From Swiss-Prot:
F-type ATPases have 2 components, CF(1) - the catalytic core - and CF(0) - the membrane proton channel. CF(1) has five subunits: alpha(3), beta(3), gamma(1), delta(1), epsilon(1). CF(0) has three main subunits: a, b and c. Keywords: ATP synthesis, Cell membrane, CF(1), Hydrogen ion transport, Ion transport, Membrane, Transport. The lineage of its organism: Bacteria, Bacillati, Bacillota, Bacilli, Lactobacillales. Pfam families: ATP-synt. Belongs to the ATPase gamma chain family. This is ATP synthase gamma chain.
Amino acid sequence: MGASLNEIKQRIASTKKTSQITKAMQMVSAAKLTKSEGASKSFQEYSSKIRSVVTHLVAAQLSELRETEQSSLSEGNYHVMLAQRPVKKTGYIVITSDKGLVGGYNSSILKQTMSMIQEDHDSNKEYALIAIGGTGADFFKARGIDVSYELRGLTDQPTFEEVRKIVTTATTMYQNEVFDELYVCYNHHVNSLTSQFRVEKMLPITDLDPSEATSYEQEYLLEPSPEAILDQLLPQYAESLIYGAIIDAKTAEHAAGMTAMKTATDNAQNIISDLTISYNRARQGAITQEITEIVAGAAALE
């Protein structure tokens, strides 16, 4: 019985240490989440401004584009970032974390992405994958799926400079017709307890509404020309959309980490409670047995 008591005490002590670690990790993730939510809010302000400017600049092109037959879009009359072309190959940017301890965050993304790819494509020649996050890159490679480009080791609050190369690579691959459309697959941050899997079309750019341009009484003086400005601004806008998805995904990752560590801490506390009850019962049994032995010994001496 004594050995059993010592074993239970050791398990209680080790579980308490684990609980302290998971509690600390929960607090760290909560701090990261707060910071990421602030960064996401700031980015939304920037995104709204650049979207407004781009909408004004391409309003005329978009109006014509929507009235033009699909077959005429390959003649070069429209900017490559706007014109839809026949889809021979699809590009996917899949955003996951580099590490674990984030609950079902990664499994949700990868499971639904694989399901979508298998449903929409008959062979791996019909799509190209770009992986942001080591978990996703390793997942695809382990299944014999080629990863065209990957990025690992993002910081907790990624700057655009950190992701510039992979974002620019993705837009350049589209412009060079390596693939004909580009989607980003990631978990969207809803709140601290909830995230939602999203597949957002980034290229060609389709989220601009010409009617929004007429809602602002603004005029732009364009130098050297609207076309030259669009050549610079449209890729930048597309890159900002991808960067926004990365920030959103990182925020969801921190929320998932915080939730996972809270669950781990709560589970540890439940285990400690159960072990404490077991310890008290074992201790009570040991005391009862000792009393019984003493009484029996005293009776034998009479």
